[in-house]
From Swiss-Prot:
GO molecular function, one term: phosphoglycerate mutase activity
Keyword Isomerase: yes
Xref: SUPFAM superfamilies: Phosphoglycerate mutase-like (SSF53254)
InterPro entries (UniProt xref): His_Pase_superF_clade-1 (IPR013078), His_PPase_superfam (IPR029033), PG/BPGM_mutase_AS (IPR001345), Phosphogly_mut1 (IPR005952)
Active-site residues per Swiss-Prot or TrEMBL entry: H9 (tele-phosphohistidine intermediate), E87 (proton donor/acceptor)
Organism: Leptothrix cholodnii (strain ATCC 51168 / LMG 8142 / SP-6)
Enzyme class label: isomerase
Subunit details: Homodimer.
CDD domains in alphabetical order: HP_PGM_like
Reactions listed under catalytic activity: (2R)-2-phosphoglycerate = (2R)-3-phosphoglycerate
Protein name: 2,3-bisphosphoglycerate-dependent phosphoglycerate mutase
Pfam families according to UniProt: His_Phos_1 (PF00300)
Sites marked Transition state stabilizer: H182
Amino acid sequence: MYKLVLIRHGESTWNLENRFTGWTDVELTPTGVSQAQQAGRLLKEGGYEFDIAYTSVLKRAIWTLWHALDQMDRTWLPVAHSWRLNERHYGALQGLNKGDMAKQYGDAQVLIWRRSYDTPPPALEADDPRGQRQDVRYAKLDAEQVPLTECLKDTVARVLPFWNDSIAPAILSGKRVLIAAHGNSIRAMVKYLDGISDADIVNLNIPNGVPLVYELDADLKPIRSYYLGDAEAVAKAAAAVANQGKA
């Protein structure tokens, strides 16, 4: 049996302000730092050990991973960064308040933008300063690989090659893997692992800063999965994520 641990980054400044974040590179709040540290403590108390960690190229996930590893006294672990683990790109919604958008367009439309599988938000213009095509961290990518908007289907399409080429081989080689990423890049992996339908994925919400453990069989099929920590607190945190897009 293999184990895989996924952690969504701790609360960010734009989570706190209820803004669509996407590829915008924002900081953790003090609460987010505490959540990341608590994740590390839970992993240490549970006796978890890791051989390699993966994260995105966005600092809210990078710092979450670092704070968790610091609590485990494992900051020396090798870490692989990939843009493929970035949050879903929210296009022209990036930086806008979710509640304000719900008041303007209705809760149902914002839910579609936030959670539907194949409906992307309105795209950014290519020269919009909120975009990332001039960002040095993406300089080696083709322009079309740096999105102007994404739906979850698009996110799955970029996450799965990294899973298949890097993460899955590491697990199968016996390495114990920790991934710190984002709500939608984790939803993409969970959808794939659990075989969640396109329709049902709308109901999946990933809480900030809570370790999600997968026990996998020899074919990397889930035996079971569970969050570490207090079940009631985890459920409340997931419900809070679900309510972010309401007026």
